[in-house]
A protein has these predicted regions:
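Alpha-helical transmembrane-bundle signature of multi-pass membrane transport and export proteins
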Residues: 1-171
Length: 171
């Protein structure tokens, strides 16, 4: 039997607010994954300590461990749109300051770990807000497709970000 209620997976992208947020999410996620490759490589150029290289992953994952539950509550309590803007600005600021610090050769392992922590802090707060705002942007019929597109964006970024990071490191 044919399901006449089928909604195309791409249908939510015809909704401008969802499309803009989805696109911004992909760009942000690609930046996050690119940073993971770049930060690990940069740490190896700053120190030969395997412990410090491992600390990059700790600085990346610790905010998710510490702040995922509070971030979910924040997504329920605060205006999700403003929370998304705040977290994106936090991550943008951390990335810009990290870039400037690195360009001017003032980077140290501690500074790299600090900026990595703040980038992941932003991402850990951003994720529940992004997931919670989707039902506000699309119709109930489009919700499954919109959630699927959210997963697609994460996986696209998970492939593209490290590849981009590798190209940047190799350049």
């Amino acid at each position: 039997m044919h399901n006449t209620n089928h909604i195309s997976i791409w249908k939510p992208l015809s909704n401008r607010p969802f499309r803009l947020l989805w696109t911004a999410n992909i760009v942000s996620l690609i930046g996050t994954w690119t940073h993971e490759v770049g930060a690990s490589w940069l740490m190896t150029s700053l120190t030969l300590s395997p412990f410090m290289v491992a600390m990059v992953q700790t600085a990346t994952t610790l905010p998710f461990f510490l702040f995922s539950l509070p971030a979910g509550a924040m997504a329920d309590i605060f205006d999700r749109r403003r929370l998304l803007i705040f977290t994106q600005l936090l991550m943008l600021t951390a990335a810009l300051l990290l870039g400037i610090t690195t360009i001017f050769f003032k980077i140290t392992p501690f500074i790299l770990l600090t900026f990595t922590f703040f980038l992941s802090l932003g991402a850990s707060i951003n994720a529940p807000a992004w997931q919670s705002i989707i039902p506000e942007l699309v119709s109930r019929k489009e919700l499954v497709s919109a959630i699927t597109l959210g997963s697609v964006s994460f996986n696209i970024a998970r492939v593209a970000g490290p590849a981009l990071g590798g190209l940047i490191v190799a350049a």
